[in-house]
Amino acid sequence: MNKVILLCRPGFEKECAAEITDKAGQREIFGFARVKENAGYVIYECYQPDDGDKLIRELPFSSLIFARQWFVVGELLQHLPPEDRITPIVGMLQGVVEKGGELRVEVADTNESKELLKFCRKFTVPLRAALRDAGVLANYETPKRPVVHVFFIAPGCCYTGYSYSSNNSPFYMGIPRLKFPADAPSRSTLKLEEAFHVFIPADEWDERLANGMWAVDLGACPGGWTYQLVKRNMWVYSVDNGPMAQSLMDTGQVTWLREDGFKFRPTRSNISWMVCDMVEKPAKVAALMAQWLVNGWCRETIFNLKLPMKKRYEEVSHNLAYIQAQLDEHGINAQIQARQLYHDREEVTVHVRRIWAAVGGRRDER
């Protein structure tokens, strides 16, 4: 199986293709990307027959920015008979996957696929039973086995394949299902909530998103991102010349500072989180974020980089490389991840965590 399908936001297929071509090439897994505008997915076809599996095993999924999900597939199954779509699909997967842990019957995230998505949900139950009978799926769901993917691109046309549960998105179609909180000041709140789900393992939330932490929200008005921090019982400095939602101020957890986010300097030394969603050139935001991290003004940060109209992948890569270079220059170990989230539009969300290690019997960030 030499093809890898990558799901992405419709309209960002070229960026997704540029990224996978670049990062696969760095690992000497060569091939070419098939791109159809606004399709919501890209097919990366490797030149060597087993390189699809090698790619999804060796390249960390967390290193990808524009892909929501990926899986290796075989040839396209076409003209599935309406009276029996199951048998050809089972036949394609037998000998490819054994005792898979989960089945996902998916489509691309486009308006055209909405009707097809309804079919996929109904089709999943009988297909799962047939795949279990054939030994393709285990008799119970388990996160320790590969995920079986059936990806429909049109009625009666699908790709079949798999991904590794240790190196994929845990979410169906790569999209966390989040509900907009009725009391949140703006829909942007979902960006930060999704970022927490994508970047921070669930079993680390209690430690890294803990009650009583101090946080800073730069460019906070009206408070969509501050809302997520308050919800987790943090104390928040919300920095913006624009007003904050009264509902947030009434909690007593928010201090509103009428200042420019680019000029604000924290006075506390125990700030755990800094978040930032400002409409500004990405290079300017990246420079500010690097300054916060180098100076140790926060332990972790999540921020958005607005994308230009052209060369988006190159621009994001350049900004991330700048931040990495600044950290390296000052001897700071950090983990950097970036992803175009489902709730992002012309932007990507970046997470940087300074790594704390025991040095000479004390906790130290370096």
Swiss-Prot record:
Q: List, in alphabetical order, the Gene Ontology terms for molecular function in this entry.
A: S-adenosylmethionine-dependent methyltransferase activity
Determine if Methyltransferase is one of this entry's keywords: yes
Question: Which InterPro entries does the protein's record reference?
Answer: RlmM_FDX, RlmM_THUMP-like, RNA_MeTrfase_FtsJ_dom, rRNA_MeTrfase_M, SAM-dependent_MTases_sf
Q: Which GO terms describe its cellular component?
A: cytoplasm
UniProt: S-adenosyl-L-methionine binding residues: S188, C221, P222, G223, G224, D240, D260, D277
User: GO terms for biological process?
Assistant: methylation; rRNA processing
Q: Which HAMAP family match?
A: 23SrRNA_methyltr_M
Q: Briefly, what is this protein's role? A: Catalyzes the 2'-O-methylation at nucleotide C2498 in 23S rRNA.
SUBUNIT field? Monomer.
Assigned protein family: Belongs to the class I-like SAM-binding methyltransferase superfamily. RNA methyltransferase RlmE family. RlmM subfamily.
- The protein's name in its UniProt record: Ribosomal RNA large subunit methyltransferase M
Name of the encoding gene: rlmM
